[in-house]
Protein backbone atom coordinates (compact mmCIF):
# COMPACT_ATOMS: atom_id res chain seq x y z
CA UNK A 1 0.00 0.00 0.00
CA UNK A 2 1.23 3.49 -0.89
CA UNK A 3 1.86 5.58 2.22
CA UNK A 4 2.00 9.35 1.79
CA UNK A 5 2.81 12.24 4.13
CA UNK A 6 1.17 15.66 3.79
CA UNK A 7 2.51 18.52 5.91
CA UNK A 8 0.28 21.52 6.48
CA UNK A 9 -2.46 18.92 6.17
CA UNK A 10 -5.14 21.00 7.88
CA UNK A 11 -4.24 24.04 5.81
CA UNK A 12 -5.62 25.29 2.52
CA UNK A 13 -3.51 23.51 -0.08
CA UNK A 14 -2.60 20.53 2.10
CA UNK A 15 -6.21 19.57 2.82
CA UNK A 16 -7.13 19.88 -0.85
CA UNK A 17 -4.22 17.63 -1.83
CA UNK A 18 -5.47 15.01 0.63
CA UNK A 19 -8.91 15.32 -0.93
CA UNK A 20 -7.37 14.74 -4.36
CA UNK A 21 -5.48 11.69 -3.09
CA UNK A 22 -8.64 10.32 -1.46
CA UNK A 23 -10.47 10.67 -4.78
CA UNK A 24 -7.92 8.21 -6.19
CA UNK A 25 -8.54 5.77 -3.36
CA UNK A 26 -5.31 6.71 -1.56
CA UNK A 27 -6.16 6.85 2.14
CA UNK A 28 -2.94 5.74 3.89
CA UNK A 29 -2.00 9.35 4.52
CA UNK A 30 -0.15 10.70 7.54
CA UNK A 31 -1.40 14.23 8.18
CA UNK A 32 1.12 16.61 9.75
CA UNK A 33 0.11 19.96 11.20
CA UNK A 34 -0.10 22.16 14.29
CA UNK A 35 -3.71 22.47 15.45
CA UNK A 36 -3.08 25.25 17.94
CA UNK A 37 -5.60 27.10 15.75
CA UNK A 38 -8.15 24.43 16.55
CA UNK A 39 -10.84 25.33 14.05
CA UNK A 40 -8.57 24.13 11.23
CA UNK A 41 -9.74 20.60 12.11
CA UNK A 42 -12.74 21.31 9.85
CA UNK A 43 -10.45 21.01 6.84
CA UNK A 44 -9.60 17.44 7.87
CA UNK A 45 -12.93 16.23 9.23
CA UNK A 46 -14.29 15.04 5.85
CA UNK A 47 -11.03 13.42 4.72
CA UNK A 48 -9.64 9.91 5.05
CA UNK A 49 -6.24 9.71 6.75
CA UNK A 50 -4.43 6.91 8.56
CA UNK A 51 -2.78 9.06 11.23
CA UNK A 52 -2.31 12.60 12.51
CA UNK A 53 1.04 13.70 13.96
CA UNK A 54 1.89 17.07 15.44
CA UNK A 55 4.51 18.92 13.44
CA UNK A 56 6.68 19.45 16.52
CA UNK A 57 7.49 15.73 16.81
CA UNK A 58 7.09 14.41 13.28
CA UNK A 59 10.39 15.26 11.62
CA UNK A 60 12.73 13.40 13.97
CA UNK A 61 10.39 10.40 14.10
CA UNK A 62 10.20 10.30 10.30
CA UNK A 63 13.99 10.52 9.92
CA UNK A 64 14.35 7.58 12.30
CA UNK A 65 11.94 5.38 10.37
CA UNK A 66 8.94 5.49 12.72
CA UNK A 67 6.43 5.47 9.87
CA UNK A 68 7.82 2.72 7.68
CA UNK A 69 8.23 3.18 3.95
CA UNK A 70 6.92 6.55 2.76
CA UNK A 71 6.42 6.91 -0.98
CA UNK A 72 6.19 10.70 -1.11
CA UNK A 73 5.89 13.81 1.04
CA UNK A 74 3.73 16.74 -0.06
CA UNK A 75 5.25 19.58 1.98
CA UNK A 76 2.69 22.37 2.29
CA UNK A 77 3.38 23.34 5.91
CA UNK A 78 4.79 26.86 6.30
CA UNK A 79 4.14 30.33 7.60
CA UNK A 80 2.48 31.91 4.56
CA UNK A 81 1.82 35.37 6.01
CA UNK A 82 3.68 37.72 3.68
CA UNK A 83 3.25 40.52 6.25
CA UNK A 84 5.01 38.59 9.04
CA UNK A 85 8.04 40.63 10.12
CA UNK A 86 9.62 38.13 12.56
CA UNK A 87 12.45 36.86 10.39
CA UNK A 88 13.64 34.24 12.87
CA UNK A 89 10.17 32.70 13.10
CA UNK A 90 9.85 32.73 9.31
CA UNK A 91 13.25 31.17 8.67
CA UNK A 92 12.73 28.48 11.32
CA UNK A 93 9.35 27.50 9.89
CA UNK A 94 9.97 27.86 6.18
CA UNK A 95 13.66 27.21 5.69
CA UNK A 96 15.16 25.18 8.54
CA UNK A 97 12.15 22.86 8.81
CA UNK A 98 12.17 22.29 5.05
CA UNK A 99 15.90 21.45 5.07
CA UNK A 100 15.33 18.95 7.88
CA UNK A 101 12.49 17.39 5.94
CA UNK A 102 14.57 17.12 2.76
CA UNK A 103 17.34 15.40 4.67
CA UNK A 104 14.83 13.00 6.24
CA UNK A 105 13.39 12.23 2.80
CA UNK A 106 16.89 11.45 1.55
CA UNK A 107 17.50 9.14 4.48
CA UNK A 108 14.17 7.34 4.09
CA UNK A 109 14.07 7.23 0.28
CA UNK A 110 10.92 9.35 0.00
CA UNK A 111 10.08 11.73 -2.81
CA UNK A 112 9.58 15.40 -1.92
CA UNK A 113 7.02 17.68 -3.57
CA UNK A 114 7.07 21.05 -1.82
CA UNK A 115 5.46 24.48 -1.82
CA UNK A 116 7.61 27.33 -3.02
CA UNK A 117 6.05 30.66 -3.96
CA UNK A 118 5.82 33.35 -6.61
CA UNK A 119 6.90 35.69 -3.79
CA UNK A 120 10.44 34.59 -4.70
CA UNK A 121 10.18 36.93 -7.71
CA UNK A 122 9.15 39.96 -5.66
CA UNK A 123 9.74 43.13 -7.62
CA UNK A 124 10.71 41.39 -10.85
CA UNK A 125 8.62 41.89 -13.97
CA UNK A 126 9.71 38.52 -15.39
CA UNK A 127 8.40 35.36 -13.74
CA UNK A 128 10.67 32.60 -14.97
CA UNK A 129 12.47 30.03 -12.82
CA UNK A 130 15.84 31.74 -13.14
CA UNK A 131 17.99 33.35 -10.41
CA UNK A 132 18.27 36.49 -12.53
CA UNK A 133 14.60 37.26 -11.86
CA UNK A 134 14.39 36.36 -8.16
CA UNK A 135 14.03 39.53 -6.05
CA UNK A 136 11.87 38.89 -2.96
CA UNK A 137 10.27 41.90 -1.31
CA UNK A 138 9.76 40.35 2.13
CA UNK A 139 11.23 37.73 4.45
CA UNK A 140 8.53 35.25 3.45
CA UNK A 141 9.67 35.38 -0.17
CA UNK A 142 13.29 35.16 0.95
CA UNK A 143 12.62 32.09 3.11
CA UNK A 144 11.09 30.31 0.12
CA UNK A 145 13.87 31.42 -2.21
CA UNK A 146 16.59 30.24 0.16
CA UNK A 147 15.13 26.72 0.21
CA UNK A 148 14.84 26.72 -3.59
CA UNK A 149 18.51 27.70 -3.76
CA UNK A 150 19.39 24.92 -1.34
CA UNK A 151 17.57 22.40 -3.54
CA UNK A 152 19.44 23.65 -6.59
CA UNK A 153 22.72 22.98 -4.79
CA UNK A 154 21.64 19.58 -3.46
CA UNK A 155 20.12 18.39 -6.73
CA UNK A 156 22.21 20.29 -9.28
CA UNK A 157 21.05 23.52 -10.91
CA UNK A 158 19.12 21.59 -13.56
CA UNK A 159 18.19 18.90 -11.02
CA UNK A 160 20.30 16.37 -12.93
CA UNK A 161 21.16 14.54 -9.70
CA UNK A 162 17.45 14.02 -9.05
CA UNK A 163 16.78 12.90 -12.61
CA UNK A 164 19.69 10.47 -12.31
CA UNK A 165 18.09 8.98 -9.21
CA UNK A 166 20.74 10.17 -6.76
CA UNK A 167 18.34 12.25 -4.67
CA UNK A 168 14.98 10.84 -5.72
CA UNK A 169 12.26 13.13 -7.05
CA UNK A 170 12.36 16.70 -5.72
CA UNK A 171 9.79 19.17 -7.06
CA UNK A 172 9.18 22.75 -5.96
CA UNK A 173 5.99 24.54 -6.99
CA UNK A 174 6.05 28.32 -7.14
CA UNK A 175 2.41 28.95 -6.35
CA UNK A 176 0.94 32.16 -7.67
CA UNK A 177 -2.37 33.55 -6.27
CA UNK A 178 -4.28 30.45 -5.22
CA UNK A 179 -7.96 30.65 -4.27
CA UNK A 180 -10.67 28.13 -3.47
CA UNK A 181 -12.37 26.03 -0.78
CA UNK A 182 -10.88 25.49 2.69
CA UNK A 183 -8.89 28.73 3.03
CA UNK A 184 -11.23 30.25 5.63
CA UNK A 185 -8.71 29.92 8.48
CA UNK A 186 -6.11 32.12 6.76
CA UNK A 187 -7.53 35.43 7.95
CA UNK A 188 -5.98 38.39 6.13
CA UNK A 189 -3.95 36.01 3.92
CA UNK A 190 -7.06 34.37 2.44
CA UNK A 191 -7.67 35.13 -1.23
CA UNK A 192 -9.22 38.30 -2.61
CA UNK A 193 -12.19 36.23 -3.81
CA UNK A 194 -12.82 34.93 -0.27
CA UNK A 195 -12.70 38.40 1.29
CA UNK A 196 -14.83 39.96 -1.44
CA UNK A 197 -17.50 37.27 -1.07
CA UNK A 198 -17.89 38.07 2.63
CA UNK A 199 -17.54 41.82 2.09
CA UNK A 200 -20.37 41.81 -0.43
CA UNK A 201 -22.54 39.74 1.88
CA UNK A 202 -21.94 42.21 4.72
CA UNK A 203 -21.86 45.56 2.89
CA UNK A 204 -23.49 45.01 -0.49
CA UNK A 205 -20.31 46.06 -2.28
CA UNK A 206 -16.67 45.07 -2.71
CA UNK A 207 -13.64 47.33 -2.39
CA UNK A 208 -10.54 47.42 -4.57
CA UNK A 209 -7.40 49.53 -4.50
CA UNK A 210 -7.44 52.69 -6.55
CA UNK A 211 -4.68 53.49 -9.03
CA UNK A 212 -1.16 52.53 -7.96
CA UNK A 213 2.14 51.63 -9.57
CA UNK A 214 1.11 52.87 -12.99
CA UNK A 215 -2.08 50.79 -12.98
CA UNK A 216 -5.58 52.25 -13.07
CA UNK A 217 -8.07 51.55 -10.30
CA UNK A 218 -8.58 47.81 -9.89
CA UNK A 219 -6.35 47.14 -12.89
CA UNK A 220 -3.41 45.71 -10.96
CA UNK A 221 -2.99 42.20 -12.35
CA UNK A 222 -2.19 38.85 -10.79
CA UNK A 223 -2.03 35.27 -11.96
CA UNK A 224 -4.99 33.81 -10.05
CA UNK A 225 -5.15 30.00 -9.95
CA UNK A 226 -8.01 27.83 -8.70
CA UNK A 227 -7.10 25.26 -6.05
CA UNK A 228 -8.40 22.33 -8.13
CA UNK A 229 -5.77 23.13 -10.75
CA UNK A 230 -3.02 23.30 -8.11
CA UNK A 231 -4.00 19.84 -6.88
CA UNK A 232 -4.14 18.43 -10.41
CA UNK A 233 -0.59 19.56 -11.19
CA UNK A 234 0.75 18.24 -7.87
CA UNK A 235 -0.78 14.86 -8.68
CA UNK A 236 0.60 14.93 -12.23
CA UNK A 237 4.11 15.15 -10.80
CA UNK A 238 3.26 12.45 -8.26
CA UNK A 239 2.41 10.27 -11.27
CA UNK A 240 5.72 11.16 -12.98
CA UNK A 241 8.46 10.38 -10.43
CA UNK A 242 11.19 10.85 -13.03
CA UNK A 243 10.50 14.58 -13.32
CA UNK A 244 12.19 16.99 -10.89
CA UNK A 245 12.81 20.72 -10.73
CA UNK A 246 11.32 24.03 -9.66
CA UNK A 247 8.22 25.03 -11.59
CA UNK A 248 5.84 27.96 -11.69
CA UNK A 249 2.30 26.97 -10.82
CA UNK A 250 -0.05 29.63 -12.10
CA UNK A 251 -2.30 29.80 -15.13
CA UNK A 252 0.11 31.74 -17.33
CA UNK A 253 -2.65 34.35 -17.59
CA UNK A 254 -2.62 37.65 -15.68
CA UNK A 255 -6.06 39.06 -14.92
CA UNK A 256 -6.99 42.32 -13.16
CA UNK A 257 -8.52 42.48 -9.71
CA UNK A 258 -11.52 44.03 -11.47
CA UNK A 259 -12.16 40.61 -13.03
CA UNK A 260 -12.18 38.95 -9.61
CA UNK A 261 -14.55 41.54 -8.15
CA UNK A 262 -16.87 41.39 -11.15
CA UNK A 263 -16.91 37.60 -11.01
CA UNK A 264 -17.71 37.54 -7.28
CA UNK A 265 -20.51 40.10 -7.54
CA UNK A 266 -22.04 38.60 -10.67
CA UNK A 267 -21.91 35.08 -9.26
CA UNK A 268 -23.76 36.27 -6.16
CA UNK A 269 -26.23 38.21 -8.30
CA UNK A 270 -26.83 35.07 -10.32
CA UNK A 271 -27.59 33.07 -7.18
CA UNK A 272 -30.30 35.60 -6.31
CA UNK A 273 -31.77 35.59 -9.83
CA UNK A 274 -30.23 38.88 -10.99
CA UNK A 275 -28.50 39.41 -14.31
CA UNK A 276 -24.75 39.89 -14.71
CA UNK A 277 -23.43 43.43 -15.17
CA UNK A 278 -20.31 44.79 -16.82
CA UNK A 279 -17.58 46.53 -14.84
CA UNK A 280 -18.79 50.03 -15.66
CA UNK A 281 -22.34 49.21 -14.58
CA UNK A 282 -21.10 47.56 -11.39
CA UNK A 283 -19.08 50.64 -10.41
CA UNK A 284 -21.89 53.05 -11.34
CA UNK A 285 -24.26 51.04 -9.17
CA UNK A 286 -21.82 51.27 -6.24
CA UNK A 287 -21.30 47.51 -6.18
CA UNK A 288 -17.55 47.97 -6.70
CA UNK A 289 -15.79 50.78 -4.84
CA UNK A 290 -12.17 51.94 -5.12
CA UNK A 291 -10.21 52.93 -2.01
CA UNK A 292 -6.80 54.64 -1.65
CA UNK A 293 -3.78 52.36 -1.81
CA UNK A 294 -2.53 51.78 1.78
CA UNK A 295 0.82 53.25 2.78
CA UNK A 296 1.75 50.04 4.63
CA UNK A 297 1.91 48.13 1.33
CA UNK A 298 3.92 50.63 -0.68
CA UNK A 299 7.16 49.05 -1.88
CA UNK A 300 6.01 45.59 -0.75
CA UNK A 301 3.25 44.96 -3.26
CA UNK A 302 3.34 43.06 -6.54
CA UNK A 303 1.15 44.99 -8.99
CA UNK A 304 1.63 42.40 -11.72
CA UNK A 305 2.37 38.68 -11.80
CA UNK A 306 2.07 36.18 -14.62
CA UNK A 307 3.62 32.74 -14.48
CA UNK A 308 5.90 31.74 -17.32
CA UNK A 309 4.79 28.14 -17.89
CA UNK A 310 7.51 27.20 -20.38
CA UNK A 311 9.34 24.92 -17.94
CA UNK A 312 6.13 23.30 -16.70
CA UNK A 313 4.88 22.60 -20.21
CA UNK A 314 8.28 21.22 -21.25
CA UNK A 315 7.78 18.37 -18.77
CA UNK A 316 4.72 17.19 -20.68
CA UNK A 317 2.23 18.50 -18.13
CA UNK A 318 -0.56 19.90 -20.30
CA UNK A 319 -3.23 20.45 -17.65
CA UNK A 320 -5.64 23.27 -18.70
CA UNK A 321 -6.22 26.04 -16.16
CA UNK A 322 -9.52 27.72 -15.30
CA UNK A 323 -9.79 31.46 -15.87
CA UNK A 324 -10.95 33.78 -13.10
CA UNK A 325 -14.52 33.92 -14.37
CA UNK A 326 -14.88 30.13 -14.23
CA UNK A 327 -12.92 29.43 -11.06
CA UNK A 328 -14.34 32.28 -8.99
CA UNK A 329 -17.90 31.45 -10.03
CA UNK A 330 -17.40 27.85 -8.87
CA UNK A 331 -15.84 29.06 -5.63
CA UNK A 332 -18.64 31.52 -4.88
CA UNK A 333 -21.19 28.75 -5.33
CA UNK A 334 -19.24 26.59 -2.86
CA UNK A 335 -18.99 29.44 -0.33
CA UNK A 336 -22.70 30.14 -0.63
CA UNK A 337 -23.47 26.48 0.08
CA UNK A 338 -21.36 26.64 3.25
CA UNK A 339 -23.32 29.68 4.43
CA UNK A 340 -26.72 28.13 3.73
From Swiss-Prot:
UniProt cofactor note: Binds 1 NADP(+) per subunit.
Gene Ontology biological-process entries: ADP-L-glycero-beta-D-manno-heptose biosynthetic process; carbohydrate metabolic process
Catalyses which reaction(s): ADP-D-glycero-beta-D-manno-heptose = ADP-L-glycero-beta-D-manno-heptose
Enzyme class: isomerase
InterPro entries, sorted: Epimerase_deHydtase, Heptose_epim, NAD(P)-bd_dom_sf
A Pfam family of this chain: Epimerase
Keyword field contains Membrane: no
Annotated residues for binding of NADP(+): 12-13, 33-34, 40, 76-80, 93, 144, 178, 186
Binding site for substrate: 177, 188, 195, 209-212, 222, 301
Pathway: Nucleotide-sugar biosynthesis; ADP-L-glycero-beta-D-manno-heptose biosynthesis; ADP-L-glycero-beta-D-manno-heptose from D-glycero-beta-D-manno-heptose 7-phosphate: step 4/4
GO molecular function, one term: NADP binding
Disulphide bonds in the chain: none
Cofactor requirements of the protein: NADP(+)
Domain of life: Bacteria
CDD domains: ADP_GME_SDR_e
Active site feature: 140 (proton acceptor), 186 (proton acceptor)
Record keywords, A-Z: Carbohydrate metabolism, Isomerase, NADP
Cross-referenced PANTHER family: ADP-L-GLYCERO-D-MANNO-HEPTOSE-6-EPIMERASE (PTHR43103:SF3), NUCLEOSIDE-DIPHOSPHATE-SUGAR EPIMERASE (PTHR43103)
Function (record text): Catalyzes the interconversion between ADP-D-glycero-beta-D-manno-heptose and ADP-L-glycero-beta-D-manno-heptose via an epimerization at carbon 6 of the heptose.
Family the UniProt entry places it in: Belongs to the NAD(P)-dependent epimerase/dehydratase family. HldD subfamily.
NCBIfam families, sorted: heptose_epim
Domain notes: Contains a large N-terminal NADP-binding domain, and a smaller C-terminal substrate-binding domain.
Subunit-level organization: Homopentamer.
Name the record gives this protein: ADP-L-glycero-D-manno-heptose-6-epimerase
Annotated organism of origin: Albidiferax ferrireducens (strain ATCC BAA-621 / DSM 15236 / T118) (Rhodoferax ferrireducens)
Gene name, Swiss-Prot/TrEMBL: hldD
